[in-house]
From Swiss-Prot:
Residues in Cyclin N-terminal domain copies: 13-142
Entry protein name: Cyclin-J-like protein
Family: Belongs to the cyclin family. Cyclin J subfamily.
The UniProt record lists the keyword DNA-binding: no
InterPro entries documented for this protein: Cyclin (IPR039361), Cyclin-like_dom (IPR013763), Cyclin-like_sf (IPR036915), Cyclin_C-dom (IPR004367), Cyclin_N (IPR006671)
Gene3D superfamilies named in the record: Cyclin-like
Native organism: Mus musculus (Mouse)
Name of encoding gene: Ccnjl
Length: 387
């Protein structure tokens, strides 16, 4: 069946099943001594999956398998970690993607990504590690990730009642929806960069990606009745995750400026030119905008979005972005917030993630979300490569 599940007649039933499955997911403890290498291997798997044209759900499942396997077993060497990472990707592709897209071992070994690291995986090593992974997860790879929920929520992401900047109706629903989808998938990739997102259920992360995208596109209301009905989440429920995503977005913009400044400093007499970074915010079509407003009052686009979002969230608690009962919040309210007049925030162009197959992939984000939260001794139930 070629029809995606989220467009089928049983989409609601599949969504309910995934929501039930995510409640049984194990807790991520962040106990691996090689956790500091996680971002590097996330980049490796991202590059490999894009090189092999794998679907997002396969990439997200591969990284989920890697994270939780590292969390349970004592992986002590980079060779072991490379072996497990590649095996996770191949196993996830077999489970999530079409058969004709599953990469061959030779294809993986011949990529510049691995050959530049002097790494090669044999068929015997792959088979042994795949069996080890399957046993570690009790032969159950039906593990929901944010990628499994996102497309279902995107179906309700735009409506004819949406307004831009709280006043101007959207001019073209089709183009706006395309741009929101691009933004949402951008935020979905951002969630791979930090294990803090394991604090949230996958469906919460996916819904937050849609909410953050609507905030960046200045669509009002930030969270619609349709989105609340489809996801069963209120704006308050998603507030913490959305804010983390917007902080990450702000750091990406700052990194782009830093990369541009460093590049210009290295080339004498060079003129200003657009900087290219691993993650770039997406392009979206020109929307009807109010008269020009002085932007000097703002510190940075994402900071303004966070403040405006918090302000609207506070108004939502007193009477509502959404009419009717939105249900109890799982998060504590924000402190008293200063009102902020909304105005269009310029968003840099092009999101096409330019992840060049380089000799040594760079980390995509430099944001820190308080790693002290994941402190404690390293405890492991078993060694995964013990003879």
């Amino acid at each position: 069946m070629d029809e995606p599940w989220w467009e089928g007649r049983v989409a609601s039933d599949v969504h309910c099943t995934l929501r039930e499955k995510e409640l049984k997911l194990p807790t991520f403890r962040a106990h691996s001594p090689l956790l500091k290498s996680r971002r590097f291997f996330v980049d490796i798997l991202t590059l490999l999956s894009r090189h092999c044209h794998l679907c997002p759900s396969a990439r997200h499942l591969a990284i989920y398998l890697l994270d939780h396997f590292m969390d349970q077993y004592n992986i002590t060497t980079s060779k072991q970690l490379y072996t497990v990472a590649v095996s996770c990707l191949l196993l996830a592709s077999k489970f999530e993607d079409r058969e004709d897209r599953v990469p061959k071992l030779e294809q993986i070994n011949n990529t510049r990504i691995l050959s530049s690291q002097n790494f090669s995986l044999t068929k015997k090593e792959l088979l042994t590690t795949e069996l080890l992974l399957l046993e570690a997860f009790s032969w159950d790879l039906c593990l929901p990730t944010p990628a499994h929920f996102l497309d279902y929520y995107l179906l309700a992401s735009i409506s004819q009642k949406d307004h831009h900047c709280h006043a101007w109706p959207t001019t073209c629903l089709r183009k706006t929806k395309e741009c929101l989808k691009e933004y949402a998938h951008y935020f979905l990739e951002v969630t791979l960069q930090d294990h803090i997102f394991y604090k949230f259920q996958p469906s919460v992360v996916a819904a937050a990606c849609v909410g953050a995208s609507r905030i960046c596109l200045q669509l009002s209301p930030y969270w619609t009745r349709d989105l609340q009905r489809v996801s069963s989440y209120s704006l308050e429920h998603l507030s913490t995750c959305i804010e983390i995503l917007l902080v990450a977005y702000d750091n990406v913009l700052k990194d782009a400026v830093a990369v541009k400044s460093q590049t210009l400093a290295m080339v004498p007499g060079s003129s200003s030119a657009p900087a290219q970074v691993l993650f770039q915010p997406p392009t979206y079509p020109t929307l009807s905008q109010p008269p020009p407003t002085t932007l000097a009052q703002f510190q940075s686009p994402a900071q303004d979005l966070c403040l405006a979002y918090r302000d609207s969230l506070q108004a939502h608690r007193s009477g509502g972005l959404l009419s009717g009962d939105t249900g109890p919040s799982l998060h504590t309210p924000y402190p008293t917030l200063q009102p902020l007049d909304m105005c269009p925030v310029p968003v840099p162009a092009s999101l096409s993630m330019q992840m060049a197959i380089a000799a040594e992939p760079r980390h995509c984000l430099t944001a820190s979300y308080g790693s002290s939260y994941f402190s404690g001794s390293h405890m492991f139930p078993a060694g995964c490569f013990d003879s």
